């Protein structure tokens, strides 16, 4: 049996993985209870994150079907962070905790199998809006390096699968101007194989509006593996001042919001 633990502020998630014959058992016993915040995760999302890891480590032509996942069993205590019950808030469980579940299951299996270093570990949920418009996007970052090669840069990692909105589309449809949209060079962790770089997304608002950001990896860096260095932590700034990882605040005409998304962890010592 192999196991791992991750801290999802202010809670922890534990994962023990047992491979017995043709069965894989993933057990989240010891995970913190659900709480009043919105990082709680429904069991269906927890299972999806575990299935994602299994898909990554098996043949690429394996079909996504009930039969393919029949040998995989996922258990979690009722009412814990990764098996929340009503009336728990779960919005960030779907976007943020799911990413951390992927991290801990990969880390547990890393005791037995070659696995990638941690990727950016967040979806960097970004939203602007007022009575006239709403803009919402998840923003990519760096993928962790694999034992065979560098991690890709500026991509959606793990449970995220959305496309990046082109700068031209944003400026045509919204009262926003794109100041920077580029790779965050050097943010991937160093190593025999480098982690992918995150991105910089900088937007100036042309109307008064509200900003909401829901993100992780602003305090703790995506860890490297096998002597590889950690990826850079993410940052959220408004007019140059660093903000907390989760916030809602008023913006005024001319304010500038800048996302610097995390890089992926490196793999192996240089």
Question: Predicted regions span which residues?
Answer:
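Glycine/proline-enriched, intrinsically flexible loops and inter-domain linkers
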Residues: 1-270
């Amino acid at each position: 049996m192999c196991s791992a633990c991750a801290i999802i502020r202010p809670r922890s998630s534990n994962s023990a993985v047992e491979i017995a014959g043709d069965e894989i058992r993933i057990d989240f016993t010891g995970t913190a209870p659900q709480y009043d915040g919105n990082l709680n995760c429904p069991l269906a999302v927890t299972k999806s994150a575990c299935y994602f890891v299994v898909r990554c480590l098996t043949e690429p032509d394996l079909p996504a079907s009930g039969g393919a996942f029949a040998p995989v069993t996922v258990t979690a205590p009722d009412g814990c962070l990764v098996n929340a019950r009503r009336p728990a808030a779960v919005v960030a469980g779907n976007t943020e905790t799911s990413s951390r579940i992927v991290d801990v299951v990969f880390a547990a299996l890393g005791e037995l199998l070659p696995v990638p270093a941690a990727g950016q570990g967040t979806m960097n949920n970004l939203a602007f809006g007022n009575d006239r418009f709403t803009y919402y996007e998840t923003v990519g970052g760096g993928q962790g390096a694999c034992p065979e090669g560098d991690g890709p840069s500026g991509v959606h990692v793990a449970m995220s699968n959305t496309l990046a909105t082109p700068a031209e589309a944003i400026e045509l449809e919204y009262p926003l101007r794109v100041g920077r949209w580029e790779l965050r060079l050097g943010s991937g962790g160093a190593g025999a194989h480098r982690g992918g770089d995150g991105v910089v997304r900088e937007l100036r608002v042309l109307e008064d509006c509200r900003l909401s950001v829901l993100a992780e990896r602003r305090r703790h860096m995506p860890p490297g593996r096998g002597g590889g260095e950690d990826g850079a932590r993410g940052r959220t700034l408004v007019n140059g001042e660093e903000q907390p990882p989760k916030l809602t605040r008023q913006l005024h005409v001319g304010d500038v919001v800048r996302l610097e998304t995390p890089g992926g962890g490196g793999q192996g010592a240089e």
